[in-house]
């Protein structure tokens, strides 16, 4: 189970990830996005997350740039993101169409890529099979 609690973007925890900082929230705010910050409470992981709300063609999109910083166990990525998305959806405006994550976590394909000597990721249609709908 994951719960999120809203807070000010100036209260984001210090991090080496530029895209999850109060500075980035300010930059994106000046570019017309609406930044929001949330503390994450979960048995799997902890931390906080910056969410950027963008208006696009009459719809609102939620973007999570390079976050959340702290991943769950590798086998729990999908379930964790589903639970986090549901928790965030309860705190976002109802007209947000979807949440997009640009995860800073180790790829689920990293070990296999190294062992097999792959030069690139599997083709998109195969990677997307892991997508949560």
Locate predicted features.
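Short amphipathic alpha-helix that is part of the acyltransferase structural core
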Residues: 1-27
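Covalent nucleotidyltransferase
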Residues: 130-132
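Conserved donor-binding loop and adjoining core beta-sheet/short helix segment
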Residues: 27-128
């Amino acid at each position: 189970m994951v719960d999120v609690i809203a807070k000010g973007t100036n209260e984001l925890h210090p991090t080496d990830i530029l895209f999850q900082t109060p500075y980035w929230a300010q930059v994106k705010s000046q570019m017309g996005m609406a930044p929001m910050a949330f503390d994450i409470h979960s048995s799997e992981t902890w931390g906080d997350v910056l969410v950027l709300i963008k208006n696009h063609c009459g719809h609102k999109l939620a973007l999570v740039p390079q976050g959340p910083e702290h991943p769950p166990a590798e086998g729990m990525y999908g379930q964790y993101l589903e639970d986090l998305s549901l928790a965030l959806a309860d705190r976002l405006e109802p007209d947000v169409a979807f949440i997009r994550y640009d995860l800073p976590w180790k790829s689920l394909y990293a070990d296999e890529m190294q062992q097999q000597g792959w030069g690139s990721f599997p083709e998109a249609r195969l990677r997307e099979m892991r997508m949560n709908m």
